[in-house]
Amino acid sequence: MSLDKIMNEAISPWMKGDGPDSDIVLSSRIRLARNFKKYQFSTMQNEEETKQIQELFKKEFINKTVEPFGEFELLKMNELTPLQRRVLVEKHLISPNLAGTEYGACLLSESEHISVMLNEEDHIRIQCLFSGLQLSEALQSANQIDNWIEKEVEYAFDESLGYITSCPTNVGTGLRASVMIHLPGLVLTKRISRIIQVIQKLGLVVRGIYGEGSEALGNIFQVSNQMTLGKSEEDIIADLKSVIQQIIQQEKMARELIVQNSSIELEDKVYRSYGILANSRLIQSAEAANCLSDLRLGIDLGYIQGISRNILTELMVLTQPGILQQYAGGPLGPEERDYRRATLIRERLRIEKN
């Protein structure tokens, strides 16, 4: 695996799979926050300590195969251009926070479904991504990587509190589990606000597609646990999975209601969006996201035939500003991005239909 391959292949291999409930759940993510006993927290570290952590990973974990994940590549933020960092964020491989650091780094697996962020808010954050609703599978992979790393380093751990982290909400298991979920039915029936309120009362967090502070573009929401203290990893996963399954049922009911009461209006909405995507010469990211959401809904309901349902996930990533500019070989103005976005979508749909 090389940096060029990571940058030039916008769609990570894990995105191409179909997991359970993938008609509504786009992806599952597990993140484990860990700190090393011998170093100060990242927020208090000096430059030398951050470099030591990078060198530790370069020495112990690079060019070593971990079954079944293969070899890992170390990407240092200060060796990447701002555009390359942005691409990694848009592919969900690193956080915006890590992209903004000079001494952060990312240990990335060949399939790109596992990344270990170094010198972010914590010394390391292990992230595992799976398609569909596969929280338990993602946790299993994260724990394998966690055990692999712990053979070489000693974590900051307290017998009564658990893993010690920079943010108090992560103390305990250090586990943040999240699910990316497509909810056009609940949005169209105007039930989404009530659902979000219920989710929040259960102690969960609802965010946009790129996490904290981001918009729910394309009717895609990210639902995650908040507290990690006092619960086991299995309990956190079970609680979140139970809520997600209820949301899935609510979304299915909302879709059925729309089909029963407004079938022709919904079909018209789907085909109008399909027409925009298939024929536009300029399209902004927000409009593209909304139209792609409609198209995906039309595919899931059987209105549109012959197009993969993965097209929403794929084109939501491919049409992000950073990836468009990476493909173009340099910076693009807003109108140039809109032109390239429209061209890419048209071409992708043409390939699907042929």
Swiss-Prot record:
Belongs to the ATP:guanido phosphotransferase family. It comes from Bacillus anthracis. ATP binds at residues 27-31, 92, 125, 176-180, 207-212. Appears to be allosterically activated by the binding of pArg-containing polypeptides to the pArg-binding pocket localized in the C-terminal domain of McsB. GO terms for molecular function: ATP binding; creatine kinase activity; protein kinase activity. It comes from the Bacteria. The keyword ATP-binding applies. The gene is mcsB. GO terms for cellular component: extracellular space. This is Protein-arginine kinase. Keywords: Allosteric enzyme, ATP-binding, Kinase, Nucleotide-binding, Transferase. Residues 24-254 form the Phosphagen kinase C-terminal domain. InterPro entries: Arg_Kinase, ATP-guanido_PTrfase, ATP-guanido_PTrfase_AS, ATP-guanido_PTrfase_cat, Gln_synth/guanido_kin_cat_dom. It holds the Pfam family ATP-gua_Ptrans. It is an enzyme of class 2 (transferase). It catalyses: L-arginyl-[protein] + ATP = N(omega)-phospho-L-arginyl-[protein] + ADP + H(+). Catalyzes the specific phosphorylation of arginine residues in a large number of proteins. Is part of the bacterial stress response system. Protein arginine phosphorylation has a physiologically important role and is involved in the regulation of many critical cellular processes, such as protein homeostasis, motility, competence, and stringent and stress responses, by regulating gene expression and protein activity. GO terms for biological process: phosphocreatine biosynthetic process. Its EC number is 2.7.14.1. A motif (RDXXRA motif of the pArg binding pocket involved in allosteric regulation) lies at residues 337-342. The keyword Nucleotide-binding applies.
